[in-house]
Amino acid sequence: MKKIGFIGAFDKIDLIIYAARILTELRKRVLVVDTTILQKAKYIVPAINPTKFYVTDYEGIDVAVGFENLELIDRYLGDLESSYDIILLDIDSSEMFDRFNMQNADKLYFVTAFDNFSLRKGIEIIGDIRERLNMTKILFEREIIKENDEYLNLLTLTYPIDWNREKFYFPYDQGDLTAIIENQRVTKIKLKNLSEQFRDSLLMLVQEISPEIRTGDIKRVFKEL
């Protein structure tokens, strides 16, 4: 079972759910865990009887909300380890990073835009992490600006973070935001209305999470969704 962490203050639950949707279509058993303070998944993922903590199905994805560690999810489900191939965790605090033992994750992504809150709050989260870690950047920008990446490197220069060479750029524009909001409104995951750059980056992200999946199979799913 792979454990993948998406770290940062930026709103990333939709991105995580989109990646999970593609993976489930490719016969991967995926659990999305929203550990964030706002628990946005509670409001965008339909649930029949939402309680303080629960797991619900959303288009083949299991989504967990309200849990404080993986042990509680395991107790809730009965057997977490054998139930899923991949767990994708949305984390926006160093406390939850520790509670979910993300230092042992198979992959860690730092997700941010370059507004002051997303950037500085996100850096504050990873600044509180004590272990030295490898992380991959997922950057949301209206256009790719080299200086933004260099600025992020400068701000984290003294932090115990080794940035991987590869990085993912997602467009931060009105068209994709409109498509995401429409998906939330109809509670349906549709990828066709997203921009080509967004879909290309999403494809590469899914491929990195599960490199055994063929690119052609991922492209087929994009056409179907």
Where are these regions (language model features)?
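A short, Lys/Arg-enriched amphipathic alpha-helix followed by its capping loop at the start of a domain
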Residues: 19-28
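Conserved catalytic-core segment of NTP-binding enzymes
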Residues: 17, 86, 91-171
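Regulatory and interdomain segments flanking nucleotide-handling catalytic cores
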Residues: 189, 193, 208-215
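Short, highly selective alpha-helical patches that border small-molecule cofactor pockets
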Residues: 12-20, 122, 202
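Inter-domain helical "communication" segments and dimerization helices
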Residues: 47-66, 75, 125-134, 157-166, ...
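P-loop NTP-binding site
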Residues: 212-225
